[in-house]
Amino acid sequence: MASRGVNKVILVGNLGQDPEVRYMPNGGAVANITLATSESWRDKQTGEQKEKTEWHRVVLFGKLAEVAGEYLRKGSQVYIEGALQTRKWQDQSGQERYTTEVVVNVGGTMQMLGGRQGGGAPAGGGAAPQDGGAQGGWGQPQQPQGGNQFSGGQASRPAQPAPAAPQGGNEPPMDFDDDIPF
């Protein structure tokens, strides 16, 4: 079987600014985000710690774009799976320009990482997408790749906020005195 190649990009990084969401004439949402990924190393000659940050343009379509616009903010950590795509366009002076982006549509994935910014419920009384409505997935069996994941342009939102009654003993203890190793 002859392979035609593989075009798959996986990124884990932080948003450099709030998502920019637009709607196409057909009503479909498009979100543009800039994602920063960093690597650090120690210079062998000087022993100095060095760091390099790369900025990636990411374009999300459909439900993924709507979810990104509603729940992602500058600094949010996110896992992205998409395809690399270069497009040609003309600037205001008529000069041809090229832009390379990671495109996340039907076959791609976006997964929100880290906790909610600011803690507590989101402003406006809405419910953030959660695993079955349980906070952070506690009290529910874990999904294979974790929670808050949206794949293939399909994002499900709970119909109601999480129930107020505590769930059957699966919630972790709230011991905040432990030292966190990171």
Curated annotation (Swiss-Prot):
Record field: compositional bias (Gly residues): 115-139
Ranges for region Disordered: 113-182
Keywords, ordered alphabetically: DNA damage, DNA recombination, DNA repair, DNA replication, DNA-binding
Quaternary context: Homotetramer.
Gene that produces this protein: ssb
Protein name: Single-stranded DNA-binding protein
Compositional bias (Low complexity): 140-159
InterPro entries with a match to the protein in the record: NA-bd_OB-fold (IPR012340), Primosome_PriB/ssb (IPR000424), ssDNA-bd (IPR011344)
